[in-house]
């Protein structure tokens, strides 16, 4: 079984020492969904939600959150991110919104948590901005889709 890197030999939590790792290009892609009533999706798409531009604010919230991941998740390294993209796309088949975040850096540790944080906070922002219209919305399927770079190489979800 693979050892948990954030625990020392006694089981105490520790921040992983990455100082000897080479700096490489690292990228991660994550996704999530906010499922809602068709009427709520139509309201958001029309731009008439009470709190304003739900899609635009969710994108900005995701980007901002990605940059603060180390303040939210214990033992995460603060990273200099070189790229954060958050896309929020209406999906009438859900019905709801599909959120995708791509994060990139050149550094000594990966950006998976930053991509997942971007998606999570974008989804929470959507919920917050539309809850007056639909408290039954569901945030679902937040997951890492792929990562590249670093010692462990590339990985893609099945």
UniProtKB/Swiss-Prot annotation:
It is an enzyme of class 4 (lyase). Belongs to the MoaC family. This is Cyclic pyranopterin monophosphate synthase. It comes from Azorhizobium caulinodans (strain ATCC 43989 / DSM 5975 / JCM 20966 / LMG 6465 / NBRC 14845 / NCIMB 13405 / ORS 571). GO terms for molecular function: cyclic pyranopterin monophosphate synthase activity. Catalyzes the conversion of (8S)-3',8-cyclo-7,8-dihydroguanosine 5'-triphosphate to cyclic pyranopterin monophosphate (cPMP). Pathway: Cofactor biosynthesis; molybdopterin biosynthesis. Gene3D superfamilies: Molybdopterin cofactor biosynthesis C (MoaC) domain. InterPro entries: MoaC, MoaC_bact/euk, MoaC_sf, MoCo_biosynth_MoaA/MoaC, Mopterin_CF_biosynth-C_dom. Its EC number is 4.6.1.17. It catalyses: (8S)-3',8-cyclo-7,8-dihydroguanosine 5'-triphosphate = cyclic pyranopterin phosphate + diphosphate. The lineage of its organism: Bacteria, Pseudomonadati, Pseudomonadota, Alphaproteobacteria, Hyphomicrobiales. GO terms for biological process: Mo-molybdopterin cofactor biosynthetic process. It comes from the Bacteria. Pfam families: MoaC. The active site is at 128. Keywords: Lyase, Molybdenum cofactor biosynthesis. Homohexamer; trimer of dimers. Substrate binds at residues 75-77, 113-114.
């Amino acid at each position: 079984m693979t050892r948990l890197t954030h625990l020392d030999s006694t089981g105490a939590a520790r921040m992983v020492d990455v100082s000897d790792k080479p700096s490489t290009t690292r990228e991660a892609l994550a996704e999530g969904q906010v499922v809602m009533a068709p009427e709520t999706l139509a309201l958001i798409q029309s731009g008439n939600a009470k709190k304003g531009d739900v899609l635009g604010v969710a994108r900005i919230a995701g980007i901002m959150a990605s940059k603060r991941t180390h303040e939210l998740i214990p033992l995460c390294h603060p990273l200099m991110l070189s790229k954060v993209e958050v896309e929020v796309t209406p999906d009438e088949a859900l019905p709801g919104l599909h959120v995708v975040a791509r994060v990139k850096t050149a550094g000594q540790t990966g950006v998976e948590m930053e991509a997942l944080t971007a998606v999570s906070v974008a989804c929470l922002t959507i919920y917050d901005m539309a809850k007056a219209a639909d408290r039954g919305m569901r945030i679902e399927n937040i997951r890492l889709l792929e990562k590249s770079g670093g010692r462990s190489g590339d990985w893609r979800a099945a």
